[in-house]
Structures are given as structure tokens and as C-alpha cells.
């Protein structure tokens, strides 16, 4: 009974991300604060007159464990310094620490999601596959942030699947 109460309290506290777990730390898997732009900044950047449409202010990412979701918007300008900073927004240990608050004896769903330049990628699995999910999330984040706008558009929205290309090649022979 006590464990169920603690888990319920942890969920409520995680939703507001104000809970101090140990030594003043928070329960969130993220090491950087949310950097969401103000409404005015967002409107100026995305206005018709803006010449910087191919370079978003940043990206959104989230980790979820069961019904508890942790979200962040991080500034990213495409530089090597910015890439290094944002790749360190969470680490294996911080994700494991946050997840351990919600993972009990039964398996729950774990999900990592990243949205950048209009493309969204979500990785999910059960709590027993969390370590593999973390490895995949690290690679996915690095790859996605290093793509140019043309690569994102070309690979995601305008490119035909490889299977159809192979099929056309066989027909022409």
C-alpha cells in the first residue's frame, strides 16, 4: 500500500517537476532547463517576413515512463558548440534515475520522442528494453540534429521508398 502511495505521489510531483528527490535534485531525466521561446519571439521567427525559416529556434524532445511525460524545448543553432550542449541535455544515468521512480515489478511503456524541423521521431519499448531504447535515442538525436534542412526534406517527405526504386529497376531490365 505504501509503495502505491509513493508511486502516485511521484507521478504528481513529476508532472510539475518540483519534487526534490535526493540532495536537492529533481526527478526529471533532463539536465538542462526548458528553453521554450516566448510567444512574441515565436511569432517573429515564424512570420512571413522572416528569412530564417530553415533554421528553427530549437527542437522538442520528451521522455515518458508509463503515463508520466517529461518535455523540453532546447535552443539549437546548428553550431558544434550548440550540438555538444544539446546532446548533453540528458544522459543514460539521468534517464535511468528518473525511470526508476516509475518502474515497478510490472512492465510499463517507455518512450523517447524528438521533433526537429517539422519531422518527429518516436522510439518506444517496454521498461525491460530501456537500456536499448536509451542507446537508440542517443544515436537518433545526434543524427537528426546533424541533418541539413535539405536532407530532412529529401529523406522524409520527397523521397520514394527504396523498394519502389528497386521494383522500377527490375521492370526496365
Curated annotation (Swiss-Prot):
Coiled coil: none annotated. Gene3D superfamilies: RNA silencing suppressor P19 (3.30.390.180). Residues 1-21 have a biased composition (Basic and acidic residues). Keywords: Host-virus interaction, Inhibition of host innate immune response by virus, RNA-binding, Suppressor of RNA silencing, Viral immunoevasion. It holds the Pfam family Tombus_P19. Homodimer. It comes from Cucumber necrosis virus. Belongs to the tombusvirus protein p19 family. GO terms for molecular function: RNA binding. The keyword ATP-binding does not apply. This is RNA silencing suppressor p19. The keyword RNA-binding applies.
